[in-house]
Amino acid sequence: MTKKNAAPIPLILDLVDKLLEARFFTKLDIRWGYNNVRIHPDDIEKTAFKTPLGLFESLVMTFRLCNAPATFQTFMDTQFANIIATGHVVIYLDDILIFAETIRELTQLTHQVLQRIQDLDLFLRPAKCSFNQTSVEYLGLIISEGKICMDPIKLKAIQEWPLPQMVKDIQKFLGFCNFYHQFVKDYSHIAQPLFNLTKKGNPWNWTTKCNMAFETLRQTMIMSPVLMLLDHEKPFTLITDASDYATGMIIEQKDALG
């Protein structure tokens, strides 16, 4: 029986919140991901699988294992702990983001990370790495100085999204929207008719309200709203709202434009 690894995977927005004063970015992608972690010798025989060519065993951690994400995240957090502690490096599984206020500082940090990668005998995927950028795509978000946007490549999918015909279509659409929900004001309220369709036992009934919810979410995301990163030195305004089936809260700050 597998013992679940309870180590948490970082929340994407928690990582993004650390980027307030960053002006320059370098993104690195670790090649082969989970396969970089060796299986303990005592456990290798437990990985055996049968093929037409014979019986094989895995020497490295494979994908689709329930503990693979937590194990790999723990590995990365441990091996890069002192570099992460600088406050200028965040790691989400095999995606590393280095950020700084100056190119000089960014270059120094990048050298430290690359040296650690070399020491660990890890490799990068050059096609997915970018260096010394003022704007970078990271975990489905476009990050630049003081603000985050939705990835336009992913938004192209929402522009062409067909009208849902069954529950699975709704679940797929909501899965996409949930990832970007923080960009949509009153998201839970708007999406409620669609969530109702996914409840077990509810019949498929595509109503005018469902169609309006679908189009409102689609059009709001097509407009590609921008979120500003929180400045902890400025006052916060907390705005809350509630209905019979949803609660909402946003934190606002005034910028130079009010």
List PLM regions with ranges:
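Retroelement reverse transcriptase polymerase core
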Residues: 1-258
